[in-house]
Amino acid sequence: MHASTLTRCMRVAQNARCLSTAAASVQVTHSERGARLAALRERLAEETRQGPTFAEQALSLEDFAFEADAAPGTKPSRKPNASNRKPKWLKAQPTQGANYERLRKSVKSLGLSTVCEEAKCPNIGECWGGGKDGIATATIMLMGDTCTRGCSFCAVKTSRKPKPLDIEEPNKVAEAIAAWGLDYIVFTSVDRDDYEDLGAGHFAKTVSTLRAKLPEILIECLTPDFQGHDNLIDQVATSGLDVFAHNMETVERLQRRVRDYRANYKQSLHVLERAKVAAPHLVTKTSLMLGVGERNEDLFQTLRDLRNSGVDVVTFGQYLRPSTKHMPVKSYVTPEAFAEWQKVAEQMGFLYVASGPMVRSSYKAGEFFMKNLLKNRKTQVVA
């Protein structure tokens, strides 16, 4: 027998042994799966006999949401069709009206940035136009319009080295807000990891400048995580604000998929906890996006963690994809499901819960409640 023929025979025999081993492995795998399925069926049958759990009674997201992803192995279509078109309840007010135009021109003339514009908030027409109550609301975005982080859900511009901070911004902001005649204002900001203090000093100065100019105004601040540094969190928390907000964004399991690698679940919890330590009178607040792949058990655990951290206010909103470059929507959650989550959170002891497809962390849904809550707290502190 030629050497080449012998070599081929040996290869055939070796392949046969490999196939035999693989088949045995598959048989074992199938056997294990069968056992697991049998155990699962038995457990489900037992749970059915015992009745539904609290979580099942409270909410089943599968009953209230539909998937928005393309089929496995295919790209999501950019054209609207029956499978990827937004549901009818996701309708925003048009961006028009006298109040809207007045606020837009004022913001532009002063060279200010708003998260309403930069993050493409769907509520800009309602908030800037005044909505049903006729009160115009804007959220001022401090420290520029470019962030040093790149979260997969966010439409704000990113750069490793954004433009330097405008040292006159605190005064500009205070003058603008005084001219608008507001009694409740929300500040937020981009992340500025390019500064040694991560922008905490600039943020705190803006708050204290406004407080000195308008002592009675109520100030809510939606802050970055300041990389979890206590001294920086304390600096902002004690600068004169009334509401300290920092967004968890999503459940622990999905943090890396949704947020920049420098953000994380435990760090954000610590930020909210530390703000209370630095200023116990503060109302603390956070926001969660739904429709990014979260599960019921994930949300329940997140709510428990937030309550254990002393968080007072939570909001739920639907994630909407800013562009095809961003993270796709996993599911559109119905208004009924949002209402159920509001009930669950209220039963867990949160002071206020805003929950709905169009709700955002800076949305004005809670302003009237927050104003009354804060005024009552201030009265108690004085007393």
UniProtKB/Swiss-Prot annotation:
Keyword presence, Iron-sulfur: yes
Binding-site residues, [4Fe-4S] cluster 1: 116, 121, 127, 362
Free-text comment on the cofactor: Binds 2 [4Fe-4S] clusters per subunit. One cluster is coordinated with 3 cysteines and an exchangeable S-adenosyl-L-methionine.
Stretch list, region Disordered: 69-97
Reactions performed catalytically: [[Fe-S] cluster scaffold protein carrying a second [4Fe-4S](2+) cluster] + N(6)-octanoyl-L-lysyl-[protein] + 2 oxidized [2Fe-2S]-[ferredoxin] + 2 S-adenosyl-L-methionine + 4 H(+) = [[Fe-S] cluster scaffold protein] + N(6)-[(R)-dihydrolipoyl]-L-lysyl-[protein] + 4 Fe(3+) + 2 hydrogen sulfide + 2 5'-deoxyadenosine + 2 L-methionine + 2 reduced [2Fe-2S]-[ferredoxin]
NCBIfam families: lipA (TIGR00510), PRK05481.1 (NF004019), PRK12928.1 (NF009544)
HAMAP family per record: Lipoyl_synth
Annotated protein name in UniProt: Lipoyl synthase, mitochondrial
Lineage: Eukaryota, Sar, Stramenopiles, Oomycota, Peronosporales
